[in-house]
């Protein structure tokens, strides 16, 4: 995700190979020391091919290596479906002070500081992202896919997911 396929194309030009891009990072991790990472879980991912009309048989090989949930129309839809920008932004904005404190550097645990206000910011950011996606003809559901609400997504669903997912709360 994160527009990586488009960046590769910009750099490599016509020599750019077929790229299978994901909408999320496959592992839930936290840096816990120099050259050391704690992995608390595996996240489901969905994929898109670049170029969009590439031979889809490459997806069979990918499924053997790392299973995926669905295939997007193209990498723009995939990129706009990356959940991290709308999950991390709220708590980071609300907690700038704690994040910037030198004695907390590297020790800030986002999920411990995920407040009602952070969830409300994330919900608003997601609404803006969906509006951008709709302008391109996409019906984006990244936070719905992530939070699995019983009905329409509300900020409370985001808050509950961030505090109730065993794979996330340790990081």
Feature map (PLM): residue ranges:
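Residue-identity detector for glutamine
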Residues: 21, 73, 101-102, 139, ...
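Short, mixed-charge, low-aromatic patches
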Residues: 13-22, 79-88, 146-152
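Short, surface-exposed acidic
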Residues: 16-19, 68-74, 137-146
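Rossmann-like NAD(P)(H) cofactor-binding subdomain of soluble oxidoreductases
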Residues: 1-32
